Amino acid sequence: MIYLDEFTGMEVSIVDSPNRSEIGRTGLVSFETKNTLEIDTGRKRIMIPKHLRKFRINGQFVDGDLINMRPEDRLREYRRILRDLRR
């Protein structure tokens, strides 16, 4: 399940965002914090908040609000993530 993985090194694309200029941006995740993903686009690195965004990571769609936590905390929050996915 991709929601439990650490995203560093994975290919990411922004599918939906309140900021329309972010939609369609693609690259590799170079760093991940609790609230942001740092994406290396090839030309520069951009910081994208996870909140209110939808991503496609390695071909799978991911809701940014469900991954809005530290990577190591996602394993502890496994049951909450599964419950929210069922909604």
Swiss-Prot record:
Keywords: Cytoplasm, Endonuclease, Hydrolase, Nuclease, tRNA processing. SUPFAM superfamilies: Rof/RNase P subunit-like. Its main location: cytoplasm. GO terms for biological process: tRNA 5'-leader removal. It comes from the Archaea. Pfam families: RNase_P-MRP_p29. Its EC number is 3.1.26.5. GO terms for molecular function: ribonuclease P activity; RNA binding. It is an enzyme of class 3 (hydrolase). It catalyses: Endonucleolytic cleavage of RNA, removing 5'-extranucleotides from tRNA precursor. Disulfide bonds: none annotated. It is found in: Cytoplasm. InterPro entries: RNase_P/MRP_Rpp29_sf, RNP1, Rof/RNase_P-like, Rpp29/RNP1. GO terms for cellular component: cytoplasm; ribonuclease P complex. The keyword Kinase does not apply. Part of ribonuclease P, a protein complex that generates mature tRNA molecules by cleaving their 5'-ends. Consists of a catalytic RNA component and at least 4-5 protein subunits. Belongs to the eukaryotic/archaeal RNase P protein component 1 family. This is Ribonuclease P protein component 1.
